[in-house]
């Protein structure tokens, strides 16, 4: 039986149960998503955007699903801290795919700002959710998005009204917890109206050493003159598989800073689709991957320049050890109307062993004639001359290797605008290279 058949059978048998526990706005697009998934099936490696990861194999195991929305016995405020020193944050939790409703007193938000369960707000305020939900994440274009749309029952909704600035960083801790091997389908909808500002940090953790499969779809609407900093930090374990699709819509003069940091995982597949729809917008998309053992990390990006006078910068760096596999495929599309585009795309990779593998494919597709665009990639090993130089000055070979690796990824971390988060990541990355960090050291469950 093909991998997709079990999900087709599941939806045919349980669609009414799924809809019973979901808001009408989410249900309105389920059947169409199901039809699209049936037509597409899981993409094979012959599909350009999925050539480096076998998606059918990821979804082949028989995972459990919490379709009845049974409560998960966990009090995240007692067990998870994920503290970032000197960073003022408002902390929220998503347990599997369910928003944890108990908020801390310090999570006071500016007037009009909403941070809540997507399913709850979709039921209570459909006027806020319906115009945006599944608008960017088109199910006809991607089978994983279609699968998530037909199965997702909850997640996170964030709304920031016009000209409102959220001063405190919003930290969302995604916790995976279950007594069985579990599939989680999480949905996130971010709406920033004109002139709004939001700094957001997602931290992914697994509280149980079980096998998890997570599909996640994030849709982010960034209005005219709005600013969004979206940071995603993954620290799970080798039994965890995560497939994440992020869709970002930028209007005129908006600014997005998107950072993806993968420190621990089993298999991670990240997709980013960002489109410029208004002039004067800019984005900075950065990725840092540290992988060893049998980890597999695949980042795939598309930056779509549809209008003139927009700027995009991408920098992704990988450090691969042992038998780890990394992949980066980045496509920058500059349409004919997008004159005066400025774009830079860079992928740099370090393979610490001969058994680590890196696949890299930066691409420029340009149809305008007045642009400044460049792209490039490198794959190399540690500089033996530099290692020898350090050994001559009393630095051990192991310590020299760690210093070179740390210096290599620092460029990505230093691009983060939140200084306390930047400092925290410097600390986590150093401990990761030293083999001293297996899980988030800020969580009580991980100690």
Please place each PLM-identified region on the residue numbering.
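N-terminal amphipathic, basic helical "cap/leader" segment at the start of enzyme domains
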Residues: 1-146, 315, 321
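Conserved beta-strand/loop scaffold segments within soluble protein domains that form the structured core
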Residues: 111-115, 124-395, 409, 413-447
């Amino acid at each position: 039986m093909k991998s997709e058949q079990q999900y087709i059978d599941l939806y045919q048998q349980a669609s009414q149960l799924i809809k019973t526990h979901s808001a009408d706005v989410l249900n309105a697009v389920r059947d169409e998503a199901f039809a699209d998934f049936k037509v597409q099936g899981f993409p094979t490696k012959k599909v350009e955007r999925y050539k480096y990861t076998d998606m059918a194999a990821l979804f082949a195991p028989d995972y459990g699903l919490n379709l009845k929305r049974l409560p998960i016995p966990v009090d995240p405020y007692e067990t998870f801290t994920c503290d970032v020193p000197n960073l003022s944050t408002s902390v929220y939790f998503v347990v599997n795919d369910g928003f944890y409703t108990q908020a801390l007193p310090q999570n006071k938000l500016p007037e009009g700002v909403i941070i809540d369960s997507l399913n709850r707000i979709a039921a209570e305020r459909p006027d806020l959710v319906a115009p945006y939900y599944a608008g960017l994440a088109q199910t006809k274009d991607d089978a994983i998005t279609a699968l998530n749309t037909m199965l997702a029952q909850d997640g996170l909704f964030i709304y920031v009204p016009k000209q409102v600035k959220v001063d405190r960083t919003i930290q969302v801790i995604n916790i995976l917890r279950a007594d069985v091997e579990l599939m989680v389908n999480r949905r996130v909808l971010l709406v920033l109206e004109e002139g709004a500002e939001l700094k957001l940090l997602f931290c992914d953790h697994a509280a149980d050493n079980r096998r998890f499969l997570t599909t996640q779809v994030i849709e982010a609407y960034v209005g005219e003159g709005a600013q969004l900093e979206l940071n995603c930090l993954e620290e799970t374990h080798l039994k965890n598989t995560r497939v994440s699709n992020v869709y970002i819509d930028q209007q005129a003069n908006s600014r997005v800073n998107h950072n993806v940091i993968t420190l621990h995982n089993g298999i991670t597949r990240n997709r980013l689709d960002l489109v410029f729809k208004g002039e004067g917008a800019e984005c900075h998309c950065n990725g840092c991957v540290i992988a060893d053992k049998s980890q597999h990390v695949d980042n795939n990006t598309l930056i779509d320049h549809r209008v003139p006078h927009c700027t995009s910068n991408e920098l992704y760096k990988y450090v691969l050890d042992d038998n780890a596999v990394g992949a980066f495929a980045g496509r920058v599309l500059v349409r004919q109307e997008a004159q005066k585009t400025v774009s830079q795309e860079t992928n740099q990779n370090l393979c610490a062993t001969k058994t680590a593998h890196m696949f890299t494919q930066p691409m420029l597709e340009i149809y305008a004639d007045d642009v400044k665009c460049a792209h490039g990639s490198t794959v190399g090993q540690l500089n033996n001359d530099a290692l020898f130089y350090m050994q001559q000055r009393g630095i051990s070979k192991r310590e020299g290797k760690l210093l070179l690796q740390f210096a290599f990824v620092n460029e990505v971390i230093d691009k983060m605008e939140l200084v306390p988060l930047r400092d925290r990541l410097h600390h986590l990355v150093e401990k990761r290279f030293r083999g001293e960090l297996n899980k988030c050291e800020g969580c009580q469950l991980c100690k």
